[in-house]
């Protein structure tokens, strides 16, 4: 009899209702500890409003309509909430930077949600505290609707790490009526594999998009993010596990250009933090993060998922909601590569080079020239160069070349060859991610390290 079900305990708060430690909130395999969330007054959730009228200084608003009415909040704008994760705070630079970027491209109520009173705790405690924060956000959204007639479909919640699951809880409590939730590397421990009630899932909003950047297992790799698909669209940049630029050595990372605190954060959780950096970059680069529908990153890297399907490719990040098929299915997976430093956007091209001239061993490189700019030289092939053979590769250019007007070909082999062989490209075909094809031709051959320009055939 003693082994019977133990009645769970619960805590209740007047505005927000009751929180129990019953299953699935606690006492399940993924969350064995029976822990209750802290009180709303301890967590002290705050809403920091940035607007086009005051882009650099926030106004503190609450779910009381008088504070909203006396602020720069406008009901004819979308409202985007940005929610930080574990140990973080609402005044951290990245949240304000995200608002700043949003205010450059749109008229918006941008609200940074600060819950540092609940995020700076033992991790298992923080995972319970998010339930109260989610309830606070839902209460705020409900107040906007009941007091100002503001529709939840105009609300977009962007959450990083634990903040993704705060967004999920707020969405669940508003019955999935919120317009959009974006999960930026949703936290894995205590959430991966749990029932949908506990974590972010596609029923939490009309549209849910997710960026996965740190999907390695928490043990032993310390991957903080979920590898599980939890949205309508799930993006896996660079495969979703190891982000380029995150493998720097410890000292260079900590004494980073952004100062000790940013550097230390980047060292401890570089992959995990990349998700919000990609999102911020995407706001100002509407075409720079095309995601390709694919079964896996290996398949994508083997050049098997190009170009975009007839409906186009969704853009990872801010403009994911422009994708026509966004809610056709759940858990649609998309892959792409990004840059490794400040400018993360990339544009993918397929290049097919048909060689002419002598048979040699060497490297073939091509650069693209177009209405939007000029790309670097990208290696298309290295090995035995056979005239009449076509070599195909895909590149990720840091420049959106636009309509391609000409291409330049160069080859080298670094072996002294007294016969001075000449190699050329009789044709180069470039395919853009929208499927548009550009063809270029040349009759000439060149010695190594000499540029050959090909013009439209």
Swiss-Prot record:
<dbReference type="GO" id="GO:0004465">
    <property type="term" value="F:lipoprotein lipase activity"/>
</dbReference>
<feature type="binding site">
    <location>
        <position position="199"/>
    </location>
    <ligand>
        <name>Ca(2+)</name>
    </ligand>
</feature>
<dbReference type="GO" id="GO:0016042">
    <property type="term" value="P:lipid catabolic process"/>
</dbReference>
<feature type="active site" description="Nucleophile">
    <location>
        <position position="161"/>
    </location>
</feature>
<feature type="glycosylation site" description="N-linked (GlcNAc...) asparagine">
    <location>
        <position position="343"/>
    </location>
</feature>
<feature type="domain" description="PLAT">
    <location>
        <begin position="347"/>
        <end position="457"/>
    </location>
</feature>
<dbReference type="InterPro" id="IPR002331">
    <property type="entry name" value="Lipase_panc"/>
</dbReference>
<comment type="similarity">
    <text>Belongs to the AB hydrolase superfamily. Lipase family.</text>
</comment>
<dbReference type="InterPro" id="IPR000734">
    <property type="entry name" value="TAG_lipase"/>
</dbReference>
<dbReference type="InterPro" id="IPR036392">
    <property type="entry name" value="PLAT/LH2_dom_sf"/>
</dbReference>
<dbReference type="GO" id="GO:0005615">
    <property type="term" value="C:extracellular space"/>
</dbReference>
<feature type="binding site">
    <location>
        <position position="201"/>
    </location>
    <ligand>
        <name>Ca(2+)</name>
    </ligand>
</feature>
<feature type="disulfide bond">
    <location>
        <begin position="308"/>
        <end position="313"/>
    </location>
</feature>
<dbReference type="GO" id="GO:0046872">
    <property type="term" value="F:metal ion binding"/>
</dbReference>
<feature type="disulfide bond">
    <location>
        <begin position="294"/>
        <end position="305"/>
    </location>
</feature>
<feature type="active site" description="Charge relay system">
    <location>
        <position position="185"/>
    </location>
</feature>
<comment type="subunit">
    <text>Forms a 1:1 stoichiometric complex with (pro)colipase/CLPS.</text>
</comment>
<feature type="binding site">
    <location>
        <position position="196"/>
    </location>
    <ligand>
        <name>Ca(2+)</name>
    </ligand>
</feature>
<keyword id="KW-1015">Disulfide bond</keyword>
<dbReference type="Pfam" id="PF00151">
    <property type="entry name" value="Lipase"/>
</dbReference>
<feature type="disulfide bond">
    <location>
        <begin position="246"/>
        <end position="270"/>
    </location>
</feature>
<feature type="signal peptide">
    <location>
        <begin position="1"/>
        <end position="7"/>
    </location>
</feature>
<keyword id="KW-0442">Lipid degradation</keyword>
<feature type="binding site">
    <location>
        <position position="204"/>
    </location>
    <ligand>
        <name>Ca(2+)</name>
    </ligand>
</feature>
<dbReference type="InterPro" id="IPR013818">
    <property type="entry name" value="Lipase"/>
</dbReference>
<dbReference type="InterPro" id="IPR029058">
    <property type="entry name" value="AB_hydrolase_fold"/>
</dbReference>
<feature type="disulfide bond">
    <location>
        <begin position="12"/>
        <end position="18"/>
    </location>
</feature>
<keyword id="KW-0732">Signal</keyword>
<dbReference type="InterPro" id="IPR001024">
    <property type="entry name" value="PLAT/LH2_dom"/>
</dbReference>
<keyword id="KW-0443">Lipid metabolism</keyword>
<dbReference type="InterPro" id="IPR033906">
    <property type="entry name" value="Lipase_N"/>
</dbReference>
<feature type="disulfide bond">
    <location>
        <begin position="99"/>
        <end position="110"/>
    </location>
</feature>
<feature type="active site" description="Charge relay system">
    <location>
        <position position="272"/>
    </location>
</feature>
<keyword id="KW-0479">Metal-binding</keyword>
<dbReference type="InterPro" id="IPR016272">
    <property type="entry name" value="Lipase_LIPH"/>
</dbReference>
<keyword id="KW-0378">Hydrolase</keyword>
<dbReference type="GO" id="GO:0004806">
    <property type="term" value="F:triacylglycerol lipase activity"/>
</dbReference>
<feature type="disulfide bond">
    <location>
        <begin position="441"/>
        <end position="457"/>
    </location>
</feature>
<dbReference type="GO" id="GO:0047376">
    <property type="term" value="F:all-trans-retinyl-palmitate hydrolase, all-trans-retinol forming activity"/>
</dbReference>
<keyword id="KW-0106">Calcium</keyword>
<keyword id="KW-0325">Glycoprotein</keyword>
<comment type="function">
    <text>Plays an important role in fat metabolism. It preferentially splits the esters of long-chain fatty acids at positions 1 and 3, producing mainly 2-monoacylglycerol and free fatty acids, and shows considerably higher activity against insoluble emulsified substrates than against soluble ones.</text>
</comment>
């Amino acid at each position: 009899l003693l082994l019977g079900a133990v009645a769970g305990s619960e805590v209740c708060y007047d505005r927000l209702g009751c929180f129990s430690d019953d299953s699935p909130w606690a006492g399940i395999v993924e969350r064995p500890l029976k822990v209750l969330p802290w009180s709303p007054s301890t967590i002290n959730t705050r809403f920091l409003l940035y607007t086009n009228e005051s882009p650099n200084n926030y106004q503190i608003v609450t779910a009381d309509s008088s504070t909203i009415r006396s602020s720069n909040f406008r009901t004819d704008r979308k409202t985007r909430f940005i929610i930080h994760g574990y140990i973080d705070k609402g005044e951290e630079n990245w949240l304000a930077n995200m608002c700043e970027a949003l205010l450059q491209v749109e008229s918006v109520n941008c609200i940074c949600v600060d819950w540092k009173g609940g995020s700076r705790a033992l991790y298992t405690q923080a995972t319970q505290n998010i339930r109260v924060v989610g309830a606070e956000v839902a209460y705020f959204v409900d107040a906007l609707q009941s007091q100002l007639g503001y529709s939840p479909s105009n609300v977009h919640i962007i959450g990083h790490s634990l903040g993704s699951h705060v967004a999920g809880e707020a969405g669940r409590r508003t019955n999935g009526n919120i317009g959009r939730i974006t999960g930026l590397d949703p936290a894995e421990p205590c959430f991966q594999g749990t029932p949908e009630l506990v974590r972010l899932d596609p029923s939490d909003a009309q549209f849910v998009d997710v960026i996965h950047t740190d999907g390695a297992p928490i043990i032993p790799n310390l991957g903080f993010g979920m590898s599980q698909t939890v949205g309508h669209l799930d993006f896996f940049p660079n495969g979703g596990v190891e982000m380029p630029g995150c493998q720097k050595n410890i000292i260079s990372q900590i004494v980073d250009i952004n100062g000790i605190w940013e550097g230390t954060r980047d060292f401890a959780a570089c992959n995990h933090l990349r998700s919000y950096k990609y999102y911020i970059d995407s706001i100002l680069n509407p075409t720079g993060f095309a995601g390709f529908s694919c079964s896996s990153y290996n398949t994508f890297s083997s050049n098997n998922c190009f170009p975009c399907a007839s409906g186009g490719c969704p853009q990872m990040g801010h403009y994911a909601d422009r994708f026509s098929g966004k809610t056709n299915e759940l858990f649609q997976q998309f892959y792409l590569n990004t840059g490794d430093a400040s400018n993360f956007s990339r544009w993918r091209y397929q290049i097919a080079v048909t060689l002419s001239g002598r048979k040699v061993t060497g490297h073939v490189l091509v650069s693209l020239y177009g209405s939007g700019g000029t790309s670097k030289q990208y290696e298309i092939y290295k090995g035995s160069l056979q005239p009449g053979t076509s070599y195909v590769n895909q590149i990720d250019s840091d420049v959106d070349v636009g309509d391609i007007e000409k291409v330049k070909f160069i080859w080298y082999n670094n072996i002294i060859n007294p016969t001075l062989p000449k190699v050329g490209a009789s044709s180069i075909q470039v395919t853009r991610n929208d499927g548009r094809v550009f063809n270029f031709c040349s009759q000439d051959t060149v010695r190594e390290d000499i540029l050959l320009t090909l013009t439209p055939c």
